[in-house]
């Protein structure tokens, strides 16, 4: 298992470990989606776990269509309390369908904020 919480979050997600992924978040952690009324939508607590479940189900649908979600290794910013992960959704031929970044804010080896930015 990786030594940083961001990598652990993605590793556990790839294993479909819902609770393990959820436990990467601080008790007061938030996940801000790229779409919604705020702009985006801020999720907390059980809402984060529910979204992880939905994301795993979506991953199965994406793979059934011959597409793949690709997540790059996290890049930590100079203060070490923030990290950026580039990601893309690719068609079977490798064409990028969507791309974006997740901006993480960290505290005490937990995710405090996961803020998603997406280009479609």
Q: Which role does the model predict for each range below?
A:
Residues 18-20, 26-74, 78:
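A solvent-exposed, acidic/Ser-Thr-rich amphipathic alpha-helical stretch
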Residues 85-92:
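Short beta-strand segments that buttress and anchor functional surface loops
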Residues 2-28:
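Short acidic-aromatic low-complexity motifs
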Residues 97-120:
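Short beta-strand edge/turn micro-motifs at domain boundaries
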Residues 28, 78-82, 104-112:
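Short, solvent-exposed coil/turn segments at beta-strand boundaries
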Residues 69-71, 84, 96-102:
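Short, surface-exposed coil-to-beta transition loops
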């Amino acid at each position: 298992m990786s030594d940083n919480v961001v990598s652990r979050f993605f590793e556990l997600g790839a294993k479909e470990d819902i609770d393990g992924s959820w436990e990467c978040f601080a008790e007061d952690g938030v996940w801000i989606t790229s779409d919604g009324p705020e702009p985006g939508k801020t999720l907390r607590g059980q809402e984060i776990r529910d979204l992880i479940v939905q994301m795993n189900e979506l991953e199965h649908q994406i793979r059934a269509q011959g597409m793949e979600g690709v997540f790059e290794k996290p890049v930590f910013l100079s203060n070490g309390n923030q990290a950026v992960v580039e990601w893309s959704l690719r068609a079977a031929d490798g064409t990028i369908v969507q791309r974006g970044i997740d901006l993480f804010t960290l505290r005490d080896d937990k995710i405090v904020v996961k803020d998603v930015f997406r280009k479609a």
